[in-house]
């Protein structure tokens, strides 16, 4: 089989992708047998192409699954860990903007009773 285009794979359904994956795996098994038995050199070079094709099919399958999950969890309150945005550990533990902006009663009173003085300059 020749190399496949990923944009063609994206148009296929899940069952078609699974079938194509089975075909590629079967072909890879045949090529490996040919390698052991001393097959033609063109078959040996084809192993790399088939392995890449398998990887492409698996990638498209996983991308489709992930996009379907994103759609399913679109308006939910909690998201699975693998769908949350990837951030550093420190950023994930940081206070939210709302939490950081909260003030104590004492701070509020101090600001209310002693506001920042405004000065006007005479010209």
From Swiss-Prot:
Natural source organism: Arabidopsis thaliana
Lineage: Eukaryota, Viridiplantae, Streptophyta, Embryophyta, Tracheophyta
Cystine bridges: none
Full protein name: Large ribosomal subunit protein uL29w
GO molecular function, one term: structural constituent of ribosome
Keyword Ribosomal protein recorded: yes
GO biological process, one term: translation
Metal-binding in keyword set: no
Family of this protein: Belongs to the universal ribosomal protein uL29 family.
InterPro entries per the UniProt record, alphabetical: Ribosomal_uL29, Ribosomal_uL29_CS, Ribosomal_uL29_euk, Ribosomal_uL29_sf
Gene Ontology cellular component annotations, sorted alphabetically: cytosolic large ribosomal subunit
Keywords linked to the UniProt accession: Ribonucleoprotein, Ribosomal protein
């Amino acid at each position: 089989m020749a190399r496949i285009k990923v944009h063609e794979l994206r148009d296929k359904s899940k069952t078609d992708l699974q079938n194509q994956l089975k075909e590629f795996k079967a072909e890879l098994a045949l090529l490996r047998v040919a390698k052991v038995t001393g097959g033609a050199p063109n078959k040996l070079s084809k192993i790399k192409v088939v392995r890449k094709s398998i990887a492409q099919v698996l990638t498209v399958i996983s991308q489709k699954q992930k996009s379907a999950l994103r759609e399913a969890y679109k308006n939910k309150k909690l998201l699975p860990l693998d769908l949350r945005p990837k951030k550093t550990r420190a950023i994930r533990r940081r206070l939210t903007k709302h939490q950081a902006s909260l003030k104590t009663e004492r701070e509020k009173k101090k600001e209310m009773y002693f506001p920042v003085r405004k000065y006007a300059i005479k010209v």
